[in-house]
Every structure is written in structure tokens, then in C-alpha cells.
């Protein structure tokens, strides 16, 4: 069991969740710096094992931080939270198609089993502390995310391809970015690829499948991390009758410090 942050550090995370519950919108990169963030996928109980097994077989893309049993809406990672209301935006899937984006999923919730999956926004604070830029934060944009041609390990009725997020990194800092993010395997860890996006089957960096187009400057290299939108790609491909997820880039902010997931204890 991970430890919750000291009370004074939890206030900002609680305030963020309260703001989203009250209707605030927008991506969560840079919100409550130093706190762990999580992707969300919620499915009916008869699909829960498939999703859990898919996550277990694809831990780089789907590192599970918490599982809420059917009917539970409060995560142990954020006492007093409600996963139906405390994210800025949700996607509602029916038969593998997004039918709606909503700021409150309460009306769609019927004893769903919920997985919270580690998000790479968590390691952006350590990157910034090391002087490595996080461009989408600088520009007030959502992180760019791309479908790849790399298949994930199938599980039960679920199959799909890996989704990655991309951050441009100065060429002379790539090794540092790899080392820093590698300390956080519970939030995707080290990159899965550095350099040519075509090696992942990505046709154009300028046209992400999710999020906003990036700005890559001279002397920077595109660096790609496994992404928690990967389960959504499996929903598109496998077409379960119903699911609710976070909208890409719109995460669940927890009361757990990023340092809790630093396997080196450096943070």
C-alpha cells in the first residue's frame, strides 16, 4: 500500500478534484505538481477480468495503481474522491464507439469496475526539476498522443495496439530523460522509442490521434512513452458493449506523491 502525501501536500490535489467536480475543464498536465495522476477505465463486471488481464499482460502501457470493485467510486489513492465526477472530462463508449464526452459520468455509472492506471504526467515534475522542458505545459496545450503499429498482448476478448505520448527533448538531455522517467515504472517508466516516428508506424508528428499538435524545435528529438490511452485503443478494436474512460489528457489527480513510485528513492 502506498502512503498518502502529508496533509499540506494533499490540499492542492483535493482542490483540483473539487474544481473538476464543480465543472472546471482542461488537461491536467501541470496540475498539483508532485502528485501522482492516473488514467481511468471503467467497465461492467463481466468485462473486468479481460481488462485486468490486458493490463497485467501490458504493464508498460497499463500499469495498474488501483482497482475499484463494482459499485465503489472512492479510490484509496484519494480519500473522499468520487471517480465519477472528479476528472475534468470522460468518454462514454458503446460498442467500441465514443458516443459522448461528458464532465460528469454519474448518470452512466451502474456498478462498474474501475481501473486507475499510472499516467506519465506524474514524472513531468521530476523532468522539470532537472531542467528538461515539458513543451505542452509551456504552451498550455494537451500532450500529443499517437496510435502505433505495435500490437499489445491480447487478453480474453481485448486486443489493440500501443498508444504513445510524445515529448520533444533536447538531444543532449535525452539520456537524462530516459534515466529520470525510468525511475517511475508505475507511470509508464522509460521511453519505448526515441527518434524517427515512422519506426512506430506514425505517419506525421503534426497529426496526433489524441491531444494537440506538438512544437518540436531545432536540436530537439521526439521521445515516445507508452500511454494510458492504450486501453481506449483496445476498446475501439474490441467493441465491448459499454465503457467509461477519462478523456485523453484529463486525468484523476491523487493524494499520492510522485516519489512514492520512484523505485530508486531519489525523489
Curated annotation (Swiss-Prot):
SUPFAM superfamilies: PSTPO5379-like. GO terms for molecular function: lyase activity. It holds the Pfam family D-Glu_cyclase. InterPro entries: D-Glu_cyclase, Putative_hydro-lyase, UPF0317. The keyword Lyase applies. Its EC number is 4.2.1.-. Keywords: Lyase. Belongs to the D-glutamate cyclase family. This is Putative hydro-lyase Krad_0534. The lineage of its organism: Bacteria, Bacillati, Actinomycetota, Actinomycetes, Kineosporiales.
